[in-house]
């Protein structure tokens, strides 16, 4: 079961079948506009399609690929650390994974656990719009 598609067409909606990808999208979109980050994110997924593959990536190769986005050194190291931790992860506390802050945790709760009604309103603008939309939709379906 997937979270419903919204008129906002968030990238997380497209990759929600893979929780690792949801988290990676959040790292790419953190402090970077979607329109700028998206092409590089898809290049990343083409090169490293799974957490297991990305866990063996050379951070320098990722850094060179995403240099234009800014924060490339930090992001590249975080992507590898996240992937390494993810393949070992017990699935309990997503916030324990490297690079997972409030934004990524909220996206994970919404798109992977389908807990949009149980979490507080996210602070991220696009995620907040989705959260409002889906919670409004839930209420109108019940009424």
State the predicted function of each range.
Residues 7-143:
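Catalytic cores of DNA base-excision repair glycosylases
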């Amino acid at each position: 079961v997937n979270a419903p598609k919204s008129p906002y067409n968030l990238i997380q909606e497209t990759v929600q079948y893979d929780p690792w990808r949801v988290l990676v999208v959040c790292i790419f979109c953190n402090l970077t506009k979607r329109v700028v980050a998206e092409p590089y994110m898809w290049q990343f997924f083409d090169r490293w399609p799974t957490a297991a593959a990305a866990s063996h990536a050379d951070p320098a190769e990722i850094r060179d690929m995403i240099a234009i986005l800014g924060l490339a050194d930090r992001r590249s190291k975080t992507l590898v650390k996240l992937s390494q931790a993810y393949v070992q992860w017990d699935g309990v506390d997503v916030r324990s994974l490297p690079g997972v802050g409030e934004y990524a945790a909220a996206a994970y709760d919404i798109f992977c656990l389908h807990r949009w009604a149980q979490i507080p309103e996210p602070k991220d603008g696009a995620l907040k719009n989705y959260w409002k939309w889906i919670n409004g939709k839930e209420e109108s379906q019940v009424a």
